[in-house]
A protein has these predicted regions:
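N-terminal alpha-helical membrane-insertion module
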Residues: 2, 7, 26, 30-32, ...
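Short, structured coil/loop segments at alpha-helix boundaries
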Residues: 1-2, 71
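N-terminal alpha-helical signal peptides/signal-anchor transmembrane segments
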Residues: 38-59
């Protein structure tokens, strides 16, 4: 009888230790996953934003279509400007003036060769820009573009976002994700995920992580 009670108490203690350890470990493990996966999503959002800004610089509008954006990155070019001579070089500047030339020239450069510098993205990387990390390349970022009226002027706007529930582990950390979303929405009145830009007005494509 006594041994039976001791055995049951032993099991209870082991169970209690497990519960306490899990209560400590799970939030720490979730915070680590949140930090790591947020970082991966932010890298892609920054790349998409760089592409959108380049697209706007050429076409005076953003695009809400990933096919168009990816085609732009892979196949289009940008017109850039550079100085012909150092403006502190008085002799060279005098020669340009004599020739009736301005100290500037334009040239074209492939979009893919400039917007991600100093990083180099492969064709596969670019084709997969549309996909949110940790979704097995099955779920795309939510991307929208339009024009909004701002002081009787039509202003191009863009928004690209990834909800927490799409890239966090909602099986292992179901309650943690629920609590995170509830906190963002109800306590901070903020988007429950990561995004840049806004469809409500121009905000210089600011990211909500910045």
């Amino acid at each position: 009888m006594k041994k039976g009670i001791q055995f049951i108490l032993g099991l209870a203690i082991i169970g209690l230790v497990y519960v306490v350890a899990n209560l400590i470990y799970t939030p720490l493990s979730f915070d680590q996953q949140l930090e790591e996966r947020n970082a991966e999503v932010i890298v892609k959002l920054k790349d998409i934003r760089a592409a959108q800004r380049a697209y706007k610089s050429k076409y005076q509008q953003f695009t809400g279509d990933f096919d168009s954006l990816i085609n732009f990155i892979l196949n289009d070019s940008l017109t850039m400007e550079r100085k012909l001579v150092d403006e502190d070089d008085s002799v060279a500047m005098a020669q340009l003036k004599k020739q009736g030339k301005k100290n500037i020239e334009t040239y074209n450069i492939a979009v893919v060769d400039t917007i991600f510098n100093p990083r180099k993205l492969t064709k596969e990387d670019i084709q997969n820009l549309r996909y949110i990390p940790h979704t097995d390349n099955k779920v795309e970022f939510i991307m929208e573009a339009a024009h909004v009226n701002a002081g009787n002027v039509q202003v191009p706007v863009v928004e690209c976002r990834a909800p927490y529930k799409l890239y966090l582990d909602t099986v292992a950390y179901r309650q943690n994700v629920i609590n995170l979303i509830d906190d963002r929405v109800n306590n901070f009145n903020a988007y429950a995920g990561l995004k840049f830009g806004s469809m409500e007005g121009s905000n210089n494509e600011a990211g909500n992580w910045e």
